[in-house]
UniProtKB/Swiss-Prot annotation:
Its EC number is 3.2.1.14. Disulfide bonds join C45-C92, C75-C82, C180-C209. The active site is at E152 (proton donor). This is Acidic endochitinase. This protein functions as a defense against chitin containing fungal pathogens. Residues 26-292 form the GH18 domain. PROSITE patterns: GH18_1 (PS01095), GH18_2 (PS51910). The keyword Hydrolase applies. Residues 1-25 form the signal peptide. Induction: By salicylate and upon tobacco necrosis virus infection. InterPro entries: Cts1-like, Glyco_hydro18_cat, Glyco_hydro_18_chit_AS, Glycoside_hydrolase_SF, Glycosyl_Hydrlase18_Chitinase. Keywords: Carbohydrate metabolism, Chitin degradation, Disulfide bond, Glycosidase, Hydrolase, Polysaccharide degradation, Secreted, Signal. One of its GO terms (molecular function) is endochitinase activity.
Amino acid sequence: MAAHKITTTLSIFFLLSSIFRSSDAAGIAIYWGQNGNEGSLASTCATGNYEFVNIAFLSSFGSGQAPVLNLAGHCNPDNNGCAFLSDEINSCKSQNVKVLLSIGGGAGSYSLSSADDAKQVANFIWNSYLGGQSDSRPLGAAVLDGVDFDIESGSGQFWDVLAQELKNFGQVILSAAPQCPIPDAHLDAAIKTGLFDSVWVQFYNNPPCMFADNADNLLSSWNQWTAFPTSKLYMGLPAAREAAPSGGFIPADVLISQVLPTIKASSNYGGVMLWSKAFDNGYSDSIKGSIG
């Protein structure tokens, strides 16, 4: 009996150790949704390459605007045209892939006019995409794991309020995708709240802090970002040269040899974010074995 108890205790210990190791493991986040030729959401998750998939984008919201989900050529959310994605979201979740709704984007029309406006947007997102209830759920009944803030226009006001309101619902993963120059023009105050579980910094299309012939500026900027309060910090990169017209692409072999060894030493290193699935033609395959 004593031996049985010891064996059981050890089994539980190793199981819990495995769970904690896997939850702390580094991974790859990818954006999906802005190119109808990039494959389905289900097939994206089935690659086994990604820890997070960000569905992009809720491109219009706030300041009295009707919210608009823009999934490019994948589907039209009008008349429940994207509800079929519910099964694909659940398929992703069954494979331990976290699926987030990315709000904003580079070409959206969005802003928050007040703290009350931020609260209304939070309620809309919760009821339409997360654990709440609404007659209109553009992605069907599936419950997304959280919200990604890809805020690239407008002011920096009230995004911290939106983050807090979403966190108040409980069990909502929050991520942010700031540009690499510090401070970020839109998300600086929000990120400094410490509410974001993951921050994947866009180290591309920004010459002062991206890879260009060498990694000096990139790694200097990374070191500054490690001081921000987030559980996991990711290096955001283009998945192909054409994904970032203003630069920042790092060949896979260079990333593995010149960049990852340094950033993996950071205590809050979380992995790599890629823009986007449409451009990921083998890049994630090449780097995934070196991310952790």
